[in-house]
Every structure is written in C-alpha cells, then in structure tokens.
Amino acid sequence: MAMQMQLEANADTSVEEESFGPQPISRLEQCGINANDVKKLEEAGFHTVEAVAYAPKKELINIKGISEAKADKILTEAAKLVPMGFTTATEFHQRRSEIIQITTGSKELDKLLQGGIETGSITEMFGEFRTGKTQICHTLAVTCQLPIDRGGGEGKAMYIDTEGTFRPERLLAVAERYGLSGSDVLDNVAYARGFNTDHQTQLLYQASAMMVESRYALLIVDSATALYRTDYSGRGELSARQMHLARFLRMLLRLADEFGVAVVITNQVVAQVDGAAMFAADPKKPIGGNIIAHASTTRLYLRKGRGETRICKIYDSPCLPEAEAMFAINADGVGDAKD
C-alpha cells in the first residue's frame, strides 16, 4: 500500500514538473495535430508549444504545407496548453518574486541591479570600447552555472560572439575564483561565432533547439549590433536594417519568455556630431535607435572610471531607480572597485 502511495506521489511530481518550463512540440500530437504538421513546425524552428502559441498566425501560414485552417487548429490547441489569459496582479507578483537573478561578480553592481541580472528578460549593456561590456559577459557565463544560493542560475550559458572577442582563458580565471572545475565550466558554455546578420538570426533557431534539450540559464550576444553596422550602410538601408534588427530582438525576447533565460546583449555607441552635441553633457548615444530601446527591459550605460574602475549607470528600467555603481575589471573577472 505504502509502495502504491509512493508511486502515485512520484507520478504527481512528474506531472507537476512537466507543467513547469517549456513543453516539447511533440505534445501537440496528443492534441490531435498531425505528426507531419508537427514535424513541419519543428523544421521551421518551433521546438516548443510556447513558441507556437506566441507566434502570429501569419508566421505559421508562411510554413510550407500549413494552410490557414491548419494554422487556426494548431494555435487553438497550443493556446489550451499555454496559459495566455489574464491573471491577478497578486499571482503575477508571486511569480515575479520567484525570478532568479544572476550575480555579476561585483557586490556594488548587484546592489544597483537589486540582486543581479534578471532571468526572463533582456538586459542591454552599451558603452564605448574598453568599458567592460565583454568582461561582464565572460564573468556572467561562469556565474550563471553557480548554485542559486550563491547567486547563480544553475544552468548552462550560450555565447554568440560577433566581434571575435570571446576568450575561454578568461572563463578559466573566473572559474578558479569561484572554486569551480575549469573543464566543467567550459563544457557548459555553448559558443558560436556570428558572421553576418542572417547567420546571427539563424543561430537563435539553433539556440531554441538546444534549450529544449538542456537547461540554459543565460544567452549572451556580444555584440548584437556590430554586424548591422557593416551589413547595412547609409540611410537608404536604414529601414531594412531596423526591421531585421527588430525581428532579431523579438526572437531574443521570445527565448527569454519561453525558456526563462537571462538574455544579455551588448551594444555599441555612436558620437553625435550635430549642432545639439555641443550642449549635450555626453555626446555618445547607443546605436539601434528606438527599436533596441523598446526591446531591452533594462539598459545599462558603462563608462570608464580611474584606472581599472568602470562606472555602470541604470539608463532605463521599469523598476530600478536611475543610479550608478562602480566596479573593477580584475584578473579573475568583474569585482568591486578598491577604494
């Protein structure tokens, strides 16, 4: 009898575990969707039920072999499996309180961010060269693997590098600082080099497939905008560039929603050279315009301080006050500035 109760309890927990996190696309087959249609969805880059539920109907109709009637049926079934309706602010507040935050390696910076880099949203870091953007990314790629009680995310990291600045030896130095095995840390980081804007977007489809297979806590794109500056030039291509960038950022946001990963992107700055620049306190502004400004949940502005110190300012956030914190770039990653 006790054995039977134990088995029932185990069955309950497995059902509960299934209801949390993304559901594999194969679940749609149990809802009466043709296996061939599910395969077509998977080939088009939809690996979870959530991905289908969040997609506009137009996107499904564009898939070869999916008619409007089929798209309607697929979306109806996906909506039954994914809660997408209204909820009370109390429930949402409860969910928000359970959000994991990943430590940056600096206590001052964590205090500024009220715990660290938030999972399930996009954090954008922008600043000139040599302000610590890539160094924070390298440190986060290690700290996201720490246990939750040590400020980690207990998951793997994914690193899309568009500028060729990824250095595994930096990860080893940070791993040593936290007492982690260097080889394990490197095994838990999936790295890809992005060569052009289309390839950069294609990598997100691969990322989605990998996130279904394994638990990832962090997705880094360093830098999200570098390739857009070279692939699209002049004002004539501006609208095409912004549309492509908007699509890329939308996919990032969808990955953050679907898998609850922390998405960290770095952005470059441009100097204002118009007449108004003379009166601006700081004539540098992030590139990507309003599209990237609206897509990022939290925007951090990094600038140089004295020596090895850097200053991080909350540039835009829905819940953090506009404030600054000082941090340092040390041999073992990002840390606190010494007075």
UniProtKB/Swiss-Prot annotation:
GO biological process: cellular response to camptothecin; cellular response to hydroxyurea; cellular response to ionizing radiation; chromosome organization involved in meiotic cell cycle; DNA damage response; DNA recombinase assembly; DNA strand invasion; double-strand break repair involved in meiotic recombination
GO molecular function terms noted in the UniProt entry: ATP binding; ATP hydrolysis activity; ATP-dependent activity, acting on DNA; ATP-dependent DNA damage sensor activity; chromatin binding; DNA polymerase binding; DNA strand exchange activity; double-stranded DNA binding
Cross-linked residues, Glycyl lysine isopeptide (Lys-Gly) (interchain with G-Cter in ubiquitin): 58, 64
Motif (Nuclear export signal): 245-260
Superkingdom classification of source: Eukaryota
Domain HhH: 48-77
Stretches for region Interaction with PALB2: 184-257
Family annotation (InterPro entries): AAA+_ATPase (IPR003593), DNA_recomb/repair_Rad51 (IPR011941), DNA_recomb/repair_Rad51_C (IPR013632), DNA_recomb/repair_RecA-like (IPR016467), DNA_repair_Rad51/TF_NusA_a-hlx (IPR010995), P-loop_NTPase (IPR027417), RecA_ATP-bd (IPR020588), RecA_monomer-monomer_interface (IPR020587)
Modification sites for Phosphotyrosine: 54
A cellular component annotation (GO) from this entry: site of double-strand break
Modification(s) after translation: Ubiquitinated by the SCF(FBH1) E3 ubiquitin ligase complex, regulating RAD51 subcellular location and preventing its association with DNA. Ubiquitinated by RFWD3 in response to DNA damage: ubiquitination leads to degradation by the proteasome, promoting homologous recombination. Phosphorylation of Thr-309 by CHEK1 may enhance association with chromatin at sites of DNA damage and promote DNA repair by homologous recombination. Phosphorylated at Ser-14 by PLK1, triggering phosphorylation at Thr-13 by CK2, thereby promoting interaction with TOPBP1 and recruitment to DNA damage sites during S-phase. Phosphorylation by ABL1 inhibits function.
UniProtKB keywords: Acetylation, ATP-binding, Chromosome, Cytoplasm, Cytoskeleton, DNA damage, DNA recombination, DNA repair, DNA-binding, Isopeptide bond, Mitochondrion, Nucleotide-binding, Nucleus, Phosphoprotein, Ubl conjugation
Alphabetical list of SMART domains matching this protein: AAA
Residue numbers carrying Phosphoserine: 14
Localisation: Nucleus; Cytoplasm; Cytoplasm, Perinuclear region; Mitochondrion matrix
Phosphothreonine modified-residue sites: 13, 309
Positions where N-acetylalanine occurs in the chain: 2
Binding positions (ATP): 127-134
Quaternary structure (record): Forms linear homooligomers, giving rise to a RAD51 nucleoprotein filament, which is essential for strand-pairing reactions during DNA recombination. Interacts with BRCA1 and either directly or indirectly with p53. Interacts with XRCC3, RAD54L and RAD54B. Interacts with the BCDX2 subcomplex RAD51C:RAD51B. Component of the homologous recombination repair (HR) complex composed of ERCC5/XPG, BRCA2, PALB2, DSS1 and RAD51. Interacts directly with PALB2 which may serve as a scaffold for a HR complex containing PALB2, BRCA2, RAD51C, RAD51 and XRCC3. Interacts with RAD51AP1 and RAD51AP2.
Function of the molecule: Plays an important role in homologous strand exchange, a key step in DNA repair through homologous recombination (HR). Binds to single-stranded DNA in an ATP-dependent manner to form nucleoprotein filaments which are essential for the homology search and strand exchange. Catalyzes the recognition of homology and strand exchange between homologous DNA partners to form a joint molecule between a processed DNA break and the repair template. Recruited to resolve stalled replication forks during replication stress.
Family named by the database record: Belongs to the RecA family. RAD51 subfamily.
Protein name stated in the entry: DNA repair protein RAD51 homolog 1
Designated gene of the protein: RAD51
